[in-house]
Structures are given as C-alpha cells and as structure tokens.
C-alpha cells in the first residue's frame, strides 16, 4: 500500500526505522522520486529540486539498500 510523504524530515525518520528494507531512487528530467520499502507501506517522496535530492541521497542511512533506477 503506497503512501506519499511531503516532508524530507518525515522521510528520513521512516528510513531510519528497523523495518525499512530498501530505497529506490527514480530520476526524471523534472523531478526525483524516492521510494522507501518498509514492511507494511511503500513510502514515496517527490522532490523537484535536484540539489536537495542529492543531499537527501547522501544522508540516507548506511545500512539501507539503495538502488537507482532510470
């Protein structure tokens, strides 16, 4: 079941949870989508600023499996 998050802080809090398994990063010409797979929900975050997206990518937890999609 997908849920969309609007705040970067909320996304980072969810990414640090124990049940967070993986994060898929999907880049488009106009935005970047972060899809976080947890045990119950798939959380999505859409960022239109590419600099903020790069910062968020670097600040993801090191134990989280990150996969970049085209």
Swiss-Prot record:
This is Large ribosomal subunit protein eL38. The keyword Ribonucleoprotein applies. GO terms for molecular function: structural constituent of ribosome. Keywords: Ribonucleoprotein, Ribosomal protein. The keyword Ribonucleoprotein applies. It comes from the Eukaryota. GO terms for cellular component: cytosolic large ribosomal subunit. GO terms for biological process: protein-RNA complex assembly; translation. Belongs to the eukaryotic ribosomal protein eL38 family.
